[in-house]
Structure formats: structure tokens, C-alpha cells
Amino acid sequence: MREVISIHIGQAGIQVGNACWELYCLEHGIQPDGQMPSDKTIGGGDDAFNTFFSETGAGKHVPRCIFLDLEPTVVDEVRTGTYRQLFHPEQLISGKEDAANNFARGHYTIGKEIVDLALDRIRKLADNCTGLQGFLVFNAVGGGTGSGLGSLLLERLSVDYGKKSKLGFTVYPSPQVSTAVVEPYNSVLSTHSLLEHTDVAVMLDNEAIYDICRRSLDIERPTYTNLNRLIAQVISSLTASLRFDGALNVDVTEFQTNLVPYPRIHFMLSSYAPIISAEKAYHEQLSVAEITNAAFEPASMMVKCDPRHGKYMACCLMYRGDVVPKDVNAAVATIKTKRTIQFVDWCPTGFKCGINYQPPTVVPGGDLAKVQRAVCMISNSTAIGEIFSRLDHKFDLMYAKRAFVHWYVGEGMEEGEFSEAREDLAALEKDFEEVGAESAEGAGEGEGEEY
């Protein structure tokens, strides 16, 4: 069995996690109390969904995940929510005081008290697996817990489970909308360890997803629930091939192999199509070609980043529902002829496709229409460099004046860590430039040696 353990850290991680598990349960027909009427074999069957759920002797399905936060309010919502009976109480870990938007509190002072407990619970989950495949880590890097405790946990996971792949779903600060003044500090410090300790990081940001909700779903004032349900659809499409059977299944480690040309360049754009409200869906065809084109639209990217400003290095398309390989090949061929979608010259083919026959499920009373087929795209583009340049610029403006730095130093950090993280990101920006620029013949004598 190829199990996957999900780790939800901090408020963003937990709320996205809630939306994900709600959707998984609907997809598999698992009730909020963990019972699954359709599953006849009691005990750990060999069903595909057992990658995400473990089964007890009483026939209850328990998610393989932990929820981790430094303060109790958000975890308490899970403890009292609709799915409270789904989770084992030990899977919900909360501390007493929060990280106060401070990376150093999450990483050093308060985080380190709780991290051993979390690793202990993860160890229990891992012991329950026959062939653990890897971890999905959900966090945001703007706050204190997601960034600080998230980095700490990833570092410790690298030590304990060195060879297992780690996929991150990371909410980055948006260009215009901000929830904390010190976001640039937290995200730069956190990205410094994401670079080292995740194999693939899928970037998300709230502003981009707000815009998608407003534009495509006609929601005037989107809430976090709207955003999270959209993110859950993306994550569900990514993991569908682990949880269901299909024609071209895609494994967690396969993402890495196909999307990461150089170890450091592993930050991905994601998009999903069709994002459409029920009123509109009734009048549209939404063929494979249409949804494939929609997935490449700059406006459907889940992070504020225009892929037309860079080149694609690799691209993964996961289709689900009523899709046959012939349609996919035709759609991809059309995409390749478009001049707007450019690939780097050293990666001519660049497409990995997966098909899953399970049609997309929607949350009843949610915003998305029930459709016959959908596609989720994860792509590695040099345009992602923009996001880091944007962050670094904001970081520099504050750090030049050493604004707010004393809060971090007071929690036991050293100023050197700021400059070290910032230099690491400067190197990353440079990596993106080189990868976009280096052509097949120039790679020999250029900066190609450092990889």
C-alpha cells in the first residue's frame, strides 16, 4: 500500500485541511462519523482510498493526518465541527499560546515545545502504514505558526524520514492583500527551509483565489470557506490518482520526477478548470480542449503570477471524469502550437498527463457546479521567480531599517539568520533567471556547474 500522511499546520493549514477532508469524505462516501456504507470489507482492505484513510476493526475510517497549531481556537473548531467524530482526538494537537505572527516564536521558543509531541503522533501514523510514500504538508508562510513551526517540523521530518517525499501546499503572501505587517520576514525565513526540506511546493495565494471566486463564480465577497473549497478541489485532483483507480495514474514521487529539473527549482504554479457556477455550467459544453485551454489562462493561476512572463519547464495535467487519452493528446497538441505558451528550449516535450475516471465531486450547497470532467494543472514555470522578487523587495524595505527585527531577536534568533535566508532567496532568484535564459548550447560553459 502506498500511504500518504497529511500534516496541517497553523490556521491556514487547518482550514484548508478541513475543506480537503470534507471533500475526500464526500468523494469516497464516508460519513462524518467515519462509517462507509459502501465498503463491505471490515478492517484494512486493499482499497485505493486506504492510502488516505486507515480502517479500524469496527469499520470506522480514520484520516491519516494530524492538525497542529500553537493556539487552541482553530483546532477547537475541528473538535466541535461536523467531522469531529472522524478524527482521533490524538490527531488534533494544540498549544496554549500562539506564535503571534512571529517566525521565531513558531520555530524556536513555543514551537519546539510541541514539535516532539507532533513527531510522536506522526510516528504512530507512520507505524500504521505498510509502505509510507510521503507527506503532504499544508501551511501558510505569512503567519508565525505556519512559517516557524512548519519549517521546524519539515526539518525534523527530513531527519526522521529522509527518503520520503514531502509535498508542500503553501499559502504565500499576496501582492496587495496583507494580513500581517511582518509577512515578508516570515515568508523569507520560511522559504529558506522550504528550499531545503520540501521536494515539491505548490504555491497558493489568497488574492489570486479571491479574484477567481469573484470572476468565475460571481461571489461578491468571498470568504475563506469559498477559497478553501477551491483549494481542496485542486488538492483532491492531485491526490485522486492515489485514492482511485484510473488509466494513467500519477504517484507522489512521480510529481517530483516530472516537475523538478533542478532540486532548488521546485515551486509550482497550480490551476484548475472548469471553475464555473451551476447557472453557467448548464449552458456550456466544457470539452477536454476547452478546459485544457482554461487551465493555461493566466487568470486561472492560484497564485498571482503571470506565466507569460516566463517559460514553462514542465507541466503536469491531471484530468478526472469522462476523459479519454485521445482527447488529451489532441488538447495537448493544440496547446503546443500556441505561441503564448512557451517552453524552455532544453525541455521540448514537457507534459505529463494523468487521467482518473472518478468524476469531480462538489460539496452540496457549495459554489462550484457539478461537471462531468475537470483538469488540474501543476506547472513549473520560470515566472514563479516574480513571486520571490516581490517578497524580497518588501523584505529589503523593512530590513534596511531593521524594522520589527527586535521581536525576532528577542525570541532567540540571530540577525545573521535574516541575511542568510535573504541571500538564499537571492540565489534562488538568480537560479530562475539562469534556467530561463540558458539554452541548449550555452549550458556547457555557463553557470551550469553548480547543480
From Swiss-Prot:
Organism expressing this protein natively: Volvox carteri
GO molecular function: GTP binding; hydrolase activity; metal ion binding; structural constituent of cytoskeleton
The protein's name: Tubulin alpha-1/alpha-2 chain
EC number: 3.6.5.-
Subunit record text: Dimer of alpha and beta chains. A typical microtubule is a hollow water-filled tube with an outer diameter of 25 nm and an inner diameter of 15 nM. Alpha-beta heterodimers associate head-to-tail to form protofilaments running lengthwise along the microtubule wall with the beta-tubulin subunit facing the microtubule plus end conferring a structural polarity. Microtubules usually have 13 protofilaments but different protofilament numbers can be found in some organisms and specialized cells.
One GO location term (cellular component): microtubule
Cellular compartments annotated: Cytoplasm, Cytoskeleton
Residues involved in Mg(2+) binding: E71
InterPro entries: Alpha_tubulin, Tub_FtsZ_C, Tubulin, Tubulin/FtsZ-like_C, Tubulin/FtsZ_2-layer-sand-dom, Tubulin/FtsZ_GTPase_sf, Tubulin_C, Tubulin_CS
Ribonucleoprotein among keywords: no
Site residues (Involved in polymerization), renumbered to this chain: Y451
Catalytic machinery residues: E254
PTM description: Undergoes a tyrosination/detyrosination cycle, the cyclic removal and re-addition of a C-terminal tyrosine residue by the enzymes tubulin tyrosine carboxypeptidase (TTCP) and tubulin tyrosine ligase (TTL), respectively.
Cofactor(s) required, per the database record: Mg(2+)
Reaction(s) catalysed (UniProt annotation): GTP + H2O = GDP + phosphate + H(+)
Stored SUPFAM superfamilies: Tubulin C-terminal domain-like (SSF55307), Tubulin nucleotide-binding domain-like (SSF52490)
Residues bound to GTP: Q11, E71, G144, T145, T179, N206, N228
GO biological process, one term: microtubule-based process
Family: Belongs to the tubulin family.
SMART domains listed in its UniProt record: Tubulin, Tubulin_C
One of the Pfam families matching this protein, by short name: Tubulin_C
Modified residues (N6-acetyllysine): K40
Assigned keywords, A-Z: Acetylation, Cytoplasm, Cytoskeleton, GTP-binding, Hydrolase, Magnesium, Metal-binding, Microtubule, Nucleotide-binding
Function summary: Tubulin is the major constituent of microtubules, a cylinder consisting of laterally associated linear protofilaments composed of alpha- and beta-tubulin heterodimers. Microtubules grow by the addition of GTP-tubulin dimers to the microtubule end, where a stabilizing cap forms. Below the cap, tubulin dimers are in GDP-bound state, owing to GTPase activity of alpha-tubulin.
